[in-house]
Every structure is written in C-alpha cells, then in structure tokens.
C-alpha cells in the first residue's frame, strides 16, 4: 500500500503540500497581545490573503496539489463522536477542563458546522462572543483584561511547524510556546481521523511529551539523513528521542543536530539554513564562526537501542560525508553583506522552499539573496511578501510537504 505521506528529501519534486490560508485570527492581534501571540507586527489581512493565494497558485502552476489545513481538519471531524472528543480536548487545552465557561464554549462551538467550528477555533473566541450568565471563579479571577476565552492561532499559516513529514511517517510536535501548542492537536485529528490518512501513517513522535520539537527545525536531507536544529524551539532531548524512534523503526540512520542562536529572529533551523539542491544550501552567515564552522553533533544508532553522538564543527565536511557528495556549496543570505544579510534574513531570505532539485520559491523582497541564488544556477519563483513576512516566516515555513518524488 502506498503511504499518503512520502517525503525522503528536502528537494525531491513536490507533489502535494498542506497550507493554511490566513484568516480572521490575524485580526485578533493587537500591539498589547503581540508578544503572547509570538508576533512583532500586525499583517494587513486582505493583502496577506492575496499574497497567500498568489503563493498557492504559484505552487499549483508547477503541478503541485495544494491541501488546506483547515479543510482537512473539518473533514476529519465529520463523525459526531470524533467532533465531541476533539472539542472537549481543545477546550481543555485552552484552559477549561470543567465549569460553566467550559460548558458555554462547548455549546457555542458544537452547534456550528465542522468547518465553522475549526475556523472559529483558529480565529479565537472572544469573551464578547458568548453570554455566560454566571461565569465560574476561574474566568473572573484570571486574565481579567484578556479579551479571549480561547486564544487565536495567528501562527497557523506557518504549517511547517506543528508536524513534519519524514519518510512515510510524521512527527506530531509538542510545540514550545502556548500560543502554538494547540495547532498540533488539530494535526493529530487530521492524521487519526481524516480518510486520506487514518490508519495509514506511522507517527515517529507524538505530541505527548515534555520536550519540544518543531517542524521548522526538521530538515529531511535524504532517505536516511535528517538535520535538526538545536534552537529556541527544539530541545536536545527531543532530538535524541525522535532519533531513537527513527533508528528503530525506519530507514533513517543519521541525524545531524545543528546548534543555532536561541532567539526570535533565528527561531528555527530553516530560518538560517535550507537545502535547495543535491549539494547546495542557503545559509545565514551569522550562524557560522570566522572559519565558516558551526557546532553540530552527528547521531547514529548504537547498541541496544542507544545512540552514538559525535561532535563536529566543520558542517561542510559533515554534509559531504552524510550525503556522499564531493563538495557542498553554501550560499550566504544577502551575499554575506553585514547589512544586507541580517535584513534579508529577518525577512526570511534563508527560508527557501525547494519544489524540485535546484528550483525554489522565495519572497520577492529578498532581491540580493535571490540574485545570488540565480548566479548559482538555481531557478527562483518569487512570491509577494509585504504582509506575509510580518509573521517572520517564509515559503518553507508556510508549507508542509505531504508527498515528494524520490530522488
């Protein structure tokens, strides 16, 4: 049986991808709430939607099937029993296990169609949306100035992070910050209950862990090699955990853990390092030292289910050995210029989405990086980016590959 998920590289021809079109959740961001919701600016929704539609159409024009996260979720909740279970879990993860507020939220959301319910949960439920005759103590004693009963999910258009397709399976991720943790609950229901996926997908690591990992840090370099960022959003123990699972149950035998700065500008590995061809990568120069090196650790299967760990600094040498390539071409964001590079990296100049070997989708605003990619023989499809980029994520962040051709 052919698996509905199949991703054995970052660069194999992209056949199917999952996106989320930004919705009214974006309009629930205000300056006072940006930090809690992990934003540092507020996109203008109508233009963000136009830009996202242009991005989706760019992918379709290359023959790529585009699925939508919110539609898959609604289809996964077609069964009344599944919908009830999902709703109880979502409300509990929003802070209400029982009580009048829990019951009011349940009644308010349950009377909607599955699509309306999913859209509203992502949008967020304001206190003014529901008339609670007698609020419980929890509601009146906590966050009295906070306007939401259920927080919005404005980061949902970055579909890369709640999960990651690896081989014929998936990791359903425990995300780092509360603002995003409920997104992967939606993923769990898609994988377990959507007819396209249910019972057909290996879950390499589920979301029921204390340690965190996010899809922006998970790069599938080949059919047996992963690179994973040790970052603000992904912990070392989570990397060891998923490595053990993959070594035991899959063809993967190498995980390269790459250390990057733990800050918002470089929150994931794919904001500073992406694979764009068999032997070519984009890299933000700020993660490399004066010798062009970066701390990394190579994990392999050991005895009795354990793993071996080797420390390295020469990332080129590690990649050459792992990928069996005579040379590796690291293409610097912003051509390495001390002003251009951080500016374009801030606007996701390193966050390229490969749709085939040597063919990528990028934001048009990063014109220095795009010109350099073209000089290195890369075919570049530029997409509009004035509003989408305000969320600090680029084309790779906004896409979750479901199927790629093998190399």
UniProtKB/Swiss-Prot annotation:
Its main location: cytoplasm. Belongs to the arginine deiminase family. Its EC number is 3.5.3.6. The active site is at residue 397. This is Arginine deiminase. Transmembrane segments: none annotated. It comes from the Bacteria. Keywords: Arginine metabolism, Cytoplasm, Hydrolase. Disulfide bonds: none annotated. The gene is arcA. GO terms for cellular component: cytoplasm. It catalyses: L-arginine + H2O = L-citrulline + NH4(+). It is found in: Cytoplasm. Pathway: Amino-acid degradation; L-arginine degradation via ADI pathway; carbamoyl phosphate from L-arginine: step 1/2. It comes from Limosilactobacillus fermentum (strain NBRC 3956 / LMG 18251). One of its GO terms (molecular function) is arginine deiminase activity. GO terms for biological process: arginine catabolic process to ornithine; arginine deiminase pathway.
């Amino acid at each position: 049986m052919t698996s509905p998920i199949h991703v054995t590289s970052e660069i194999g021809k992209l056949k199917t991808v999952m996106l989320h079109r930004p919705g009214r959740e974006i309009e629930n961001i205000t300056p006072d709430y940006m930090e809690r919701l992990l934003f540092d600016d507020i996109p203008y929704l109508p233009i963000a939607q136009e830009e996202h539609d242009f991005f989706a159409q760019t992918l379709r024009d290359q023959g790529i099937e585009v699925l939508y996260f919110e539609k898959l979720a609604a289809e996964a909740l077609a069964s009344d029993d599944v919908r009830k279970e999902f709703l109880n879990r979502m409300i509990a993860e929003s802070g209400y296990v029982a009580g009048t507020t829990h019951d009011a939220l349940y009644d308010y959301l349950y009377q909607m169609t599955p699509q309306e319910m999913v859209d509203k949960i992502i949008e967020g439920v304001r206190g003014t949306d529901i008339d609670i005759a007698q609020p419980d103590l929890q509601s009146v004693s906590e966050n009295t100035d906070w306007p939401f009963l259920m927080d919005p999910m404005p980061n949902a258009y970055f579909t890369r992070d709640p999960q990651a397709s690896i081989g014929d399976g998936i990791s359903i991720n425990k995300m780092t910050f509360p603002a995003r943790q409920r997104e992967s609950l939606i993923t769990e229901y898609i994988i377990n209950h959507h007819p396209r996926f249910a019972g057909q997908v290996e879950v390499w690591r589920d979301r029921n862990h204390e340690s965190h990992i996010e899809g922006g840090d998970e790069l599938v370099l080949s059919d047996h090699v992963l690179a994973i960022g040790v970052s603000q959003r992904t912990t070392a123990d989570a990397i060891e955990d998923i490595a053990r699972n993959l070594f035991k149950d899959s063809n993967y035998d190498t995980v390269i853990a790459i250390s990057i700065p733990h800050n918002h500008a470089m929150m994931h590995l794919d904001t500073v390092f992406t694979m764009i061809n068999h032997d070519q990568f984009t890299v933000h120069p700020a993660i490399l030292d004066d010798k062009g090196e970066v701390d990394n650790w190579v994990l392999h299967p050991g005895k009795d289910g354990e793993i071996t760990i080797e420390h390295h600094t020469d990332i080129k040498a590690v990649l050459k050995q792992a990928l069996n390539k005579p040379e590796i071409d690291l293409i610097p964001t912003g051509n390495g210029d001390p002003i251009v590079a951080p500016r374009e990296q801030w606007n996701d100049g390193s966050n390229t989405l490969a749709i085939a070997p040597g063919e990528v989708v990028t934001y048009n605003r990063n014109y220095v990086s795009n010109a350099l990619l073209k000089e290195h023989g890369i075919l570049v499809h530029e997409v509009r980016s004035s509003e989408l980029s305000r969320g600090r994520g680029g084309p790779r962040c906004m896409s979750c590959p479901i199927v790629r051709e093998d190399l």
